[in-house]
């Protein structure tokens, strides 16, 4: 059975998801202790905490501690919709596809992704690429990063005359910075603990890199701050903002925290700063969703068709060991009988007779076992087995 365990932006707020990664690891650990997990792939992003598992023998009473749980076809449908951008807060965003690719590769490196989940995740990536190629679901402003920029614009208006500080030069910070660059902004500052990475991104965007120990000075001058680091601790505490931003500027500064865990302490609001989080981007997501309804409907059709193909492929995969064993036995029989025939044909004046004997011998040996099983079924009055044999050999039932 394939199992998906998750919390995401649809069911939980940021604070709940901040603690979810530890709790989901405990759940998976408990399942592993029961010997129920054969394959696993975690998927952790700012908007979701998920595990995909191949499991056997999960007790019906097992407690999943409030997490959403889906099985088999429902779990597969969720993953394909996720890869297509249909489950994202910003519908159609591309970042999730890269995150799914990375999750698969990491699990393969760690040896936790086996052949079944590898097949499933490979299919998910293919479906995500197909949806984006055949629809316009990812056109325009679709990432969390660009949504954060849109939110800042809705408050400040045109940002061309504003100083924007991006904290974090990882994947999410890069998305934010590029969304800013698309608007041809000049005053972009990038701060990162690793200065070289900040410098690299700033050069790419025509902005300025900031040493992390000079972050307070950058805060003092910024009109918009968008923070997206991977830090487990607050980057901007109440005390830091109070020290860095003069009282007369606090009400005009906009801070958008799109990190998980949070980068900006909630009490910063008490200073008069306008602070927004991922939860506040839901409105932007809803507007985006309305614009993309037609594309989403087309994408849903693609996903459903691809799901049917995946389910068919998985069913084929289940019988491959049986088919391989049958073929192996047939091949062994062929080789044995061919060996006998070759020896005979070397000393025979009638090779046609040898070939005739070879083919008859092969048919007799194959038919012998089949006949035994069919006669046994007839003695047991097993009509279903007899019907299946008729169907298998394309015979009329008598």
Swiss-Prot record:
The keyword NADP applies. Keywords: NADP, Oxidoreductase, Porphyrin biosynthesis. Optimum temperature is 65 degrees Celsius. GO terms for molecular function: glutamyl-tRNA reductase activity; NADP binding. Optimum pH is 7.0. The record marks 78 as: Important for activity. One of its GO terms (biological process) is protoporphyrinogen IX biosynthetic process from glutamate. Substrate binds at residues 45-48, 88, 93-95, 99. Its EC number is 1.2.1.70. NADP(+) binds at residues 168-173. InterPro entries: 4pyrrol_synth_GluRdtase, 4pyrrol_synth_GluRdtase_dimer, 4pyrrol_synth_GluRdtase_N, GluRdtase_CS, GluRdtase_dimer_dom_sf, GluRdtase_N_sf, NAD(P)-bd_dom_sf, Shikm_DH/Glu-tRNA_Rdtase. Pathway: Porphyrin-containing compound metabolism; protoporphyrin-IX biosynthesis; 5-aminolevulinate from L-glutamyl-tRNA(Glu): step 1/2. It holds the Pfam family GlutR_dimer. It catalyses: (S)-4-amino-5-oxopentanoate + tRNA(Glu) + NADP(+) = L-glutamyl-tRNA(Glu) + NADPH + H(+). During catalysis, the active site Cys acts as a nucleophile attacking the alpha-carbonyl group of tRNA-bound glutamate with the formation of a thioester intermediate between enzyme and glutamate, and the concomitant release of tRNA(Glu). The thioester intermediate is finally reduced by direct hydride transfer from NADPH, to form the product GSA. NCBIfam families: hemA. Belongs to the glutamyl-tRNA reductase family. Catalyzes the NADPH-dependent reduction of glutamyl-tRNA(Glu) to glutamate 1-semialdehyde (GSA). Possesses an unusual extended V-shaped dimeric structure with each monomer consisting of three distinct domains arranged along a curved 'spinal' alpha-helix. The N-terminal catalytic domain specifically recognizes the glutamate moiety of the substrate. The second domain is the NADPH-binding domain, and the third C-terminal domain is responsible for dimerization. This is Glutamyl-tRNA reductase. The lineage of its organism: Archaea, Methanobacteriati, Methanobacteriota, Methanomada group, Methanobacteria. The gene is hemA.
